[in-house]
C-alpha cells in the first residue's frame, strides 16, 4: 500500500495551526556577528541540559554556527517584531541597528530578549531538508521583569503565518484585586465583625 503524496502547501498550512515562539539563533564567526530567525527550537533534555533547533541545509548562518561550534538562542519578546523581521530577511548586515552584548561564549545576546541560552554544538543530525542541531547548554538567563512592566514581558509568537501575542485572561482577576480582597476579608483577633 502506497502512502499518498503530501502537498507542501497543505503541509505548511496544517503545521501553521501550531503556535510557536520566535527565537534568534546567533553566533560570531571570524569576529562577525551572525544570526537568523528560528521557530524550530525546543528544549531536549534536563540531564544533561540540551536544546535543539533546525536550520535549513542551505542556511549561511548555520554554516557560520557550525564553523564556530557555538550559538546563543535569544527568545524574542512581543515588542520585537522588527527584530524578528530583520533576522528573517536576506539583509547582508542583520545586526545593523540591533543592540547586543556578547554571551559568555561570545555569541550575541540581543538586548530586550526575554531569555538567552548559550550553547556549544553537541550533535548534528539529518532532518530531510533541515539539520537537527543539538546544543549543550553552558549558560542561560531570563530578562529581569519589573513588576509594573510585566505586561510588556510576553513572548513574540507566530501562528498561521502571522505574528501574534498572548492576550491577558480577562476572566482571572488581576493580582491587585486578589491582594485587596484578601486584605479586606482577613480576620484577626481584634476583628469586631
What are these regions (language model features)?
Residues 1-193:
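Basic, polyanion-binding surface patches
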